[in-house]
Amino acid sequence: MTDSHTSGRCGWCGTTDPLYIAYHDTEWGVPERDPRALWEKLVLDGFQAGLAWITILRKREGIRDAFDGFDPEIVARYDEADIQRLLGDVRIIRSRAKIKAAIRGAQIWLEMRDNGEDFSAWLWSFVGGEPIHTPFADYRQAPTQTEQSVAMAKALKKRGFNFCGPVIVYAFMQAVGMVNDHQTTCFRHAQVRAMAGHG
């Protein structure tokens, strides 16, 4: 039997790292509608590019603190001194390109808000405003990208966001509950489905 069957969880999260298990059991796949929380998750997924998600999880609180709680109003005003400060902060992923992408993302988030656009509603529109519940019994059956993630990635890039290719965007969609990819043998699949009002 696989870990996914013996633990009652998705096979990808394993059974040994408490941080990973807690993330799977309480966060991953839960529908997120808060615009600021969605932007934070998009930034974190961008930081993950080329790295394992557990690396980001272990650094998340440090990244959040270094980026002023992911307050777009503050991050959007970061200058070269802030970039240098962040590049010297061992708590984060010290990539100039990723740091600059986060700053630009905050500026775009504010531009959208100031233009009366709801960042959350815009992102959720790519799945018709409701979570997609997949029927996979094994997490390895899930795709790495979909028509929706390709469309969202293209739209994000058109807006000026970076580190948001279709594979990163699909991982984002899974994490924020736009797609319920908890395998059907996982206890969270039905719980997340119920959260979305599809019990």
Locate the predicted segments by residue.
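HhH-family (HhH-GPD) DNA N-glycosylase catalytic core used in base-excision repair
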Residues: 1-199
